[in-house]
Swiss-Prot record:
Residues annotated as binding CTP: 13, 148-150, 188-193, 224
Annotated protein name in UniProt: CTP synthase
Active-site residue numbers: 381 (nucleophile), 507, 509
Organism this protein belongs to: Caldanaerobacter subterraneus subsp. tengcongensis (strain DSM 15242 / JCM 11007 / NBRC 100824 / MB4) (Thermoanaerobacter tengcongensis)
Regulation affecting activity: Allosterically activated by GTP, when glutamine is the substrate; GTP has no effect on the reaction when ammonia is the substrate. The allosteric effector GTP functions by stabilizing the protein conformation that binds the tetrahedral intermediate(s) formed during glutamine hydrolysis. Inhibited by the product CTP, via allosteric rather than competitive inhibition.
């Protein structure tokens, strides 16, 4: 029988509930327990797929093609498990499902209400993950903050789960803020007390309180929080700011959080094995080398829009004992006059995924700079499409070459809408999504990187390489090194006579892990290191 852990948040949003939940998942897994994770988001959107990155950050894509919250990326990276669409549930999905059932007549004769119909649907999603994975523990993060109107049905549902499953099989962890006053440096517990009071008023008594704080939490404050919030002192956990999110599991282990949780849920206490994780954190703290990559995008003011790319670069850097510093370059500011000033000195250039025509010409100019100056380049999704456009214009001589996404009347549509997308009007959930096989061509840089002729990667796109230009562009030197097994879709392109110029239609960043960096990022960092060493000599 699965045990259930629910992670809620109080006082303010963006406290790091996701990292806390993911870290606990890592600790439990390190003791031999199987773990599944999920996130409940109280917004009415079906998924974040159509939201602006400025509203939501990155959209993380699962193997089965769900567009999900960026916290799922943290979950996958920490517990090293591929999650599914069942791991991200929004209020929109819940209401959609209930209304659909009502229209079909599933509730015939009943007045459909928040309780029990909405709450039953939420509970079913919790249990579904446990059944799907057949795991020892399900960790569910509740998005938002206690007290939000949108969160109430979710909190009511998890209260009911505790009754149905037995209190001994359910644990509530509340993540809260303990702020300090700048003039005195005094830590204040009152916001935490009020947050827990709010939680208890709807029938949930937290079993553990994780206190986000910039300063150490003195023993007397722990005792005060324990007294006023009705938990044991050892269940008041200090969660201070750290340099790297990968230190958080070690900080929680130091305070015996995993032991407390395992004892509370009456789970077997296996031997903890965090040796490789500790080694990773140690290498991350003490790099032997440094490289700088210019990330050219249009959402560079919000780094969370590219969080999986950032983490994949970190993983690859640690593999090479190298700190990868990111130079955030706004694509809209890149042009012939500014390109040298903005990109000079970068050891590598990366153009990530994106949509729309804003900043496109800047990205194309940055790619030209990488190609002409033999700077290692990695293009992801849109970064591949822009690389094809740049090559078509400046090497193949196709003046005005473009994607029909940006210029429907381009004389040379080297990137075009996928045929199966042409009759689709709706935006949400209609792209080519999820994992697909890619055949890697022997004798190419991609094959050298993967060392495998068939790989599986995650996608999120509507547009593709236009095969009418395949023969022309390859005759001019473009190398197609990855194809769909039926050879219809171009998945990877590269250039010869270049230290590292590789671009993919898929998103390799979604499959990178701290202890297993993605090979494309690993070799990209290696190429940057080699270039830096050669230049120094």
């Amino acid at each position: 029988m699965a045990k259930y852990i629910f992670v809620t948040g109080g006082v303010v949003s963006s406290l790091g509930k996701g990292i806390t939940a993911a870290s606990l998942g890592r600790l439990l897994k390190s003791r031999g327990l199987s773990v599944a994770m999920q996130k409940f988001d109280p917004y009415i959107n079906i998924d974040p797929g159509t939201m602006s990155p400025y509203q939501h950050g990155e959209v993380f894509v699962t193997e089965d093609g769900a567009e999900t919250d960026l916290d799922l990326g943290h979950y996958e990276r920490f517990i090293d498990v591929n999650l599914t669409k069942n791991s991200n549930v929004t209020a929109g999905k819940i209401y959609w499902s209930v209304i659909t059932k009502e229209r079909k007549g599933d509730y015939l004769g009943a007045t459909v209400q928040v309780i029990p119909h909405i709450t039953d649907e939420i509970k079913e999603r919790v249990y579904r993950v446990a059944k799907e994975k057949n795991v020892d523990v399900v960790i569910t993060e509740i998005g938002g903050t206690v007290g939000d109107i949108e969160s109430l049905p979710f909190l009511e549902a998890i209260r009911q789960v505790a009754i149905e499953q037995g209190r001994e099989n359910v644990m509530f962890i509340h993540v809260t803020l303990v702020p300090h006053l700048g003039n005195t440096g005094e830590l204040k517990t009152k916001p935490t007390q009020h947050s827990v009071k709010e939680l208890r008023s709807i029938g949930i008594q937290p079993d553990m309180i994780v206190c986000r704080t910039e300063l150490p939490l003195p023993q007397e404050l722990r005792e005060k929080i324990a007294l006023f919030c009705n938990v044991s002192v050892e269940a008041v956990i200090e969660n201070r700011d750290v340099e790297s999110i990968y230190q958080v599991p070690l900080e929680l282990e130091r305070q015996k959080v995993d032991e407390y949780v395992i004892k509370r849920l009456n789970l077997p206490l296996g031997q903890s094995d965090l040796k490789e994780w500790r080694e990773y954190v140690e290498k991350e703290k003490n790099p032997e080398h440094q490289v700088e990559v210019a990330l050219v995008g249009k959402y560079v003011d919000l780094h969370d829009a590219y969080i999986s790319v950032v983490e994949a670069l970190k993983h690859a850097g640690v593999y090479h004992k190298t700190a990868v510093n990111i130079r955030w370059v706004n694509a809209e500011k890149v042009n012939d006059k500014t390109v040298d000033e903005l990109l000079k000195g970068a050891d590598g250039i990366l153009v990530p995924g994106g949509f729309g025509d804003r900043g496109i010409e800047g990205k194309i100019r940055a790619i030209q700079y990488a190609r002409e100056n033999k700077i290692p380049y990695l293009g992801l999704c849109l970064g591949m499409q822009c690389a094809v456009i740049e090559f078509a214009r400046n090497v193949a001589g196709l003046k005005g070459a473009n994607s029909t996404e940006f210029d429907p009347n381009t004389p040379h549509p080297v990137i075009d809408l996928m045929p199966e997308q042409k009759d689709i009007d709706e935006k949400g959930g209609t792209m080519r999504l999820g994992v697909y096989p890619c055949k890697v061509i022997e004798g190419t840089k991609a094959y050298e990187v993967y060392k495998d002729e068939l790989v599986y990667e995650r996608h999120r796109h509507r547009y593709e390489f236009n095969n009418q230009y395949r023969e022309l562009l390859t005759s001019k030197g473009l190398v197609i090194s990855g194809l769909s097994p039926d050879e219809r879709l171009v998945e990877i392109i590269e250039l010869k006579d270049h230290p590292y110029f590789v671009a993919t239609q898929f998103h390799p960043e979604f499959k990178s892990r701290p202890l297993n960096p993605h090979p494309l990022f690993r070799d990209f960092v290696k190429a940057m290191l080699n270039l830096k060493i050669n230049n120094a000599e």
